[in-house]
Amino acid sequence: LTIVWGAFVAGLDAGLIYNTFPMMGKSVIPVEMWAHSPAWINLFENHAAVQFFHRALAMFTGLIVILYAARAYRHTTHPVFIYLFLWVFLQIGLGIATLVSQVWLPVAVFHQFGAVILLTLMIAGLQLPRRSR
């Protein structure tokens, strides 16, 4: 879901607004979040809302992945969980760097590629036998 909202951000060029983190303007939640009517359209067409939801999903996903990797690593020393733990921090950092650099192409491309790496690491961790997780 986070990757899908990232695609919305890229497709709408929504990363070109609110180039600060964690604030979006003068608040954490953008003032024009629900500017369009009907309200559900904001989820897909409102640049500020799309960027906000990608940020929120990224933080939530990051927290879940960190907790999962830390818990799984306690039961096994398989290196995939170390890579997963470290990569999620790198991915969030790349997302923030993409924003503050006003979507500098090399950083933005690495952030998109990083999403593929993170997804691959999550799948690899889930493919281990349950007793290894």
Please provide the spans of the model-predicted regions.
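Polytopic transmembrane helical bundles with strong interfacial aromatic enrichment
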Residues: 1-133
